[in-house]
Amino acid sequence: MKIKTSLLLLSVLSTSVSASAIHLSPELKIGSYHGFGVQAGITDVASLGAVYLSYSHIWYDSDRYDETVDTYRVGIQNMFGRNPNHGFQAEIGVASYDGTKTRSGEVEEKTTHGLSLGGAYVYQATPMLGLRAGVDMNIFDHNKTFVPYDTTVNFNLGAIISF
């Protein structure tokens, strides 16, 4: 077991040493829930365009509902073709939901965790600047949230900076 762990650690460390740049990508979330997010990682790892960690915070406020969702994901970016201007990002992770419903002075609260998925199209405009547009989906257990169908879907727009 120690040999397998050592080999895995060695391969991860040697891969990250060969990375060529930092991947940083702020984003805006658009939909019934709105908010922001950020990706941070390294480029050119294990034959991929980038490997990164992603965090986002979205919220919904109304007279009756006050809801927030925080997501924590790991993602990869893969560029296509000879001249890699076009690519795709895929992310998977966890989502944390906190919601409050106020009706006739009574307050009801719900908190849960669920699955978070994301995907985006990437256009690499220059070696240092890329643009992306995608969709995020957070899926929670039935009746654990105030969200219809216990699922949130958001569109996102972001810029990718590599340095």
Regions inferred by a protein language model and the residue ranges of each:
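Residues on the lipid-exposed face of transmembrane beta-strands in outer-membrane beta-barrel proteins
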Residues: 28, 38-44, 74-78, 92-94, ...
